[in-house]
A protein has these predicted regions:
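Retroelement reverse transcriptase polymerase core
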Residues: 1-125
Length: 125
């Protein structure tokens, strides 16, 4: 485990999941084409980009998988109850869930790219 300073000055705890990532099959769920996402916003009168706050920490781990995410410090062992940052398939998992949650709006006035959402409108109200 290491602490990494983020751009905003806060700290992020990182665990090295290299071995776990090697053991897991890749989830090939496709991410949206970023160029198409940008193109879809052209000509809009209003545009908002939203970043999900601690988005990965909103996704609960399945209880049977919590022990697989265990790590040790000098004093104790811990396991994640939410999806940790650094897992190979975290982005695909997040994208899949965002598309499920936002399904009624996707392609109309909302686009999702992992933990970022673009909300557009052709009208100004």
């Amino acid at each position: 485990m290491v602490l990494v300073k983020k751009a905003n000055g806060k700290w992020r705890m990182c665990v090295d999941f290299t071995d776990m990532n090697k053991a897991c099959p890749k989830d090939s769920y496709p991410l949206p084409n970023i160029d198409a996402l940008v193109d879809s916003a052209s000509g809009c009168k209003m545009l908002r980009v939203l970043d999900a706050f601690s988005g990965y920490n909103q996704i609960k781990m399945h209880p049977r998988d919590e022990s697989k995410m265990a790590f040790m410090t000098e004093t104790c062992s811990y396991c994640y109850k939410v999806m940790p940052f650094g897992l190979k398939n975290a982005g695909a998992t997040y994208q899949r869930l965002m598309e499920k949650v936002l399904a009624p709006m996707l392609g109309r006035n909302v686009q999702a790219y992992v933990d970022d959402m673009v909300v557009t409108s052709h009208e100004r109200r």
